[in-house]
Amino acid sequence: MSCCGGKCGCGAGCKCGSGCNGCGNYADITEQSSASETLVMGVVGTQKLNYGQAEAGVATEGSCSGCKCVYCTCDPCTCK
């Protein structure tokens, strides 16, 4: 479940804030887009993490209660 129904607020330093009036993390039903996205996947690095370390990293890196704001700009606010 995402925070605030899929809305993250941009906080200090363009990190995910705790407000419910931020950008939509997921596309709204009424939102339409004609642009396409390209997802590039690959293997990066050789550092090994155990399960506990990986979960801790996910919880602290630009997230608020399940919303990830990896690509976030504050003006205008774009949490993706």
Swiss-Prot record:
Originating species: Fragaria ananassa (Strawberry)
InterPro entries per record: Metalthion_15p
Role of this protein: Metallothioneins have a high content of cysteine residues that bind various heavy metals.
Similarity comment: Belongs to the metallothionein superfamily. Type 15 family.
Domain of life (superkingdom): Eukaryota
Name of the protein described by the UniProt record: Metallothionein-like protein type 2 MET1
MF (Gene Ontology): metal ion binding
Keyword Metal-binding tagged: yes
Keyword NAD applies: no
PANTHER family per UniProt: METALLOTHIONEIN-LIKE PROTEIN 2A (PTHR33543), METALLOTHIONEIN-LIKE PROTEIN 2B (PTHR33543:SF33)
A Pfam family reported for this protein in Swiss-Prot or TrEMBL: Metallothio_2
Assigned keywords, A-Z: Metal-binding, Metal-thiolate cluster
Gene that produces this protein: MET1
